[in-house]
């Protein structure tokens, strides 16, 4: 006996449900691809504890990294209130307060869920190097106070560290070459590529207490103590680097004034680097607080009166006495003070006080060496009243020193480092590039990400839209056929 028409309907619906369900299953199995989900984002915080102030930088990078070094970008820059941490030597308990404002900004930027896994570092530079030389116990107290204050934050504080001058120079070199895409670039084909070594640029950094020069020389580095080697993005780099402690802008200009005091017989000092018409007073003792200063006179209780004479020629002669150029006579591989340096070559980026001074003097548009020299001399010859009247807002603190600073930079770069009219055009005076500040902190963060284990990117399953839509249709048909078969079974076949 054959099937009734109701049974045939029931059988057809079951068959349709089976075919549709099998088709949907095949689409799921065959049309699905294994894909990489967008990588998670990691964050890092670095405090730059300089001689005159402290800055905080927040960096971010994807958790899956290129050859074990994070692809890092700057997310926040903040200048802390107050002077540098070395200024709190007599009252270290207050140093933590000066850092809290910027730390709170950083914590607000970073998602709370990531606070506990965010590493935070503080690197101190020449200001603390000088304090450590002058009074190691006070320096240790300052570092201990910093560690206590930052250790209470919800992030992963890794400690406060005194950077060597060589580290400061090398990390600055890493920063600028990374920002310019000279260490690694993302190609149109979606791959990370490394440009040629010949395109790498040198770094010229000047803080308040020290100055650094770092570059890849044209030949071997003969003095291995001036060599730094590190690995980034799967490639090894070797650079010449040297840091001159006491040759930062603030310390150098303070030393010039101290030398003028020693050459004077009274308390009225005529300063050739200050504009004519300038007159100011300062405590004599303030010139001898730093280990960079010459021997102090027996009586430091008096005040000095300083008058400017606006004599750039005499100013240059006073500045040249700082360098001890005669110790390099007859040597092509010597900068000053007997320090080994290969001849400069290639392009350089000059930042920090190099940039601040030349930006004020409108010299960042790459004038010739003779043009820069003429501009600075013309500025030094201006009367103080004219300089004050034409100064932009917010420059009162540094205004008297721009003449001396400009001439000091020229003397350092030309007579010290050996730049000439021909190589001068290779210097770029910049403070930012690629959306990030130029300095040692980004290079420091890039180097430290080698210590953070690389994470495999998260994986998931994905389909093209067409396959997904077809699968949905067949799932709906399967459900409809199944429900139809159930209805036939319940309402028809039970009759």
From Swiss-Prot:
Residues 30-466 are extracellular. It is found in: Cell membrane. It catalyses: a ribonucleoside 5'-triphosphate + 2 H2O = a ribonucleoside 5'-phosphate + 2 phosphate + 2 H(+). Its EC number is 3.6.1.5. The active site is at 168 (proton acceptor). Its cofactor is Ca(2+); Mg(2+). Glycans are attached at residues 303, 324. It is an enzyme of class 3 (hydrolase). GO terms for cellular component: plasma membrane. The chain crosses the membrane at residues 9-29, 467-487. The keyword Transport does not apply. The transmembranous domains are involved in regulation of enzyme activity. Canalicular ectonucleoside NTPDase responsible for the main hepatic NTPDase activity. Ectonucleoside NTPDases catalyze the hydrolysis of gamma- and beta-phosphate residues of nucleotides, playing a central role in concentration of extracellular nucleotides. Has activity toward ATP, ADP, UTP and UDP, but not toward AMP. This is Ectonucleoside triphosphate diphosphohydrolase 8. The lineage of its organism: Eukaryota, Metazoa, Chordata, Craniata, Vertebrata.
